[in-house]
C-alpha cells in the first residue's frame, strides 16, 4: 500500500531540489543566496536525486534551517514593514514563504518538535510562532536571499550519505550534539510547565 510522504519530507525535497537548481544554474549566485562556500555549492550542484531522496526519507529533521534567530528576526521584520509591492511574487519569495509557513506551523503545533526539527532555540521558536501571515509575506517580499540555509555543508552531508541506508539518522544526530542539548532543554521546559 502506498503511504503519502510527510509534510517535512515534501518540504525537504522541494527545498533541496530548489537549492540544487540554483547551484546548477549559477553557482556564484547560489553561494550568495544560501551563504555557501564553493565546496558546498559544488556538492549541492552535483547531488543526485537518489542522495536527495535518501536524506529526505531517512532524516527526521529539516534539511534547511532558518537564517534568522530570535535576535535577528525582529530587525528583519522591522525592515520589511510598511513596504508595499504590487507585483507578481518571484520564485525566491514563494520559496521563502513556503518554508517560513512550514516553520511557523511547526512552532504552533509544538515548540519542542520545532526546536529539534529546525535546530533553533526555544526563543526562536516562540518568535516564529508569533509571526503572523502579513509580516511573513512582507518579509518574503523584501529579502534578496533565502530565508533558509542548508543544514549540512559538503563534508557533513557526504559523511551522512556514506553511511549505510537505515543508519543515516543516527549518524546525523551524532554530528549535532547542540541540537540534542537544545531539544532536551525544550522538552524539560515543556514538561515542567504543563
Where are these regions (language model features)?
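Long, compositionally biased
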Residues: 57-89, 142-179
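N-terminal domain-start signal
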Residues: 2-53, 57-67, 169, 175-194
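Structural motif
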Residues: 6-10, 91, 120
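Amphipathic alpha-helical packing elements
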Residues: 19-55, 102-140, 144
Amino acid at each position: 500500500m502506498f503511504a503519502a510522504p510527510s509534510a517535512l519530507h515534501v518540504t525537504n525535497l522541494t527545498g533541496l531540489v530548489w537549492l540544487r537548481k540554483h547551484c546548477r544554474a549559477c553557482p556564484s549566485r547560489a553561494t550568495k543566496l544560501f551563504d555557501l562556500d564553493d565546496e558546498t555549492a559544488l556538492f549541492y550542484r552535483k547531488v543526485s536525486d537518489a542522495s536527495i531522496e535518501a536524506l529526505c526519507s531517512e532524516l527526521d529533521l529539516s534539511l534547511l534551517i532558518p537564517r534568522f534567530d530570535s535576535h535577528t528576526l525582529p530587525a528583519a521584520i522591522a525592515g520589511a514593514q510598511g513596504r508595499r509591492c504590487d507585483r507578481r511574487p518571484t520564485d525566491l519569495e514563494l520559496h521563502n514563504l513556503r518554508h517560513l509557513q512550514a516553520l511557523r506551523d511547526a512552532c504552533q503545533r509544538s515548540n519542542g518538535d520545532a526546536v529539534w526539527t529546525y535546530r533553533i532555540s526555544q526563543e526562536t521558536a516562540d518568535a516564529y510562532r508569533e509571526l503572523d501571515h502579513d509580516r511573513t509575506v512582507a518579509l518574503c517580499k523584501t529579502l534578496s536571499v533565502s530565508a533558509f540555509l542548508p543544514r549540512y555543508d559538503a563534508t557533513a552531508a557526504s559523511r551522512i550519505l556514506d553511511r549505510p541506508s537505515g543508519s543515516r539518522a543516527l549518524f546525523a544526530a551524532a554530528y549535532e550534539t547542540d541540537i540534542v542539548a537544545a531539544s532536551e532543554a525544550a522538552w524539560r521546559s515543556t514538561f515542567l510547565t504543563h
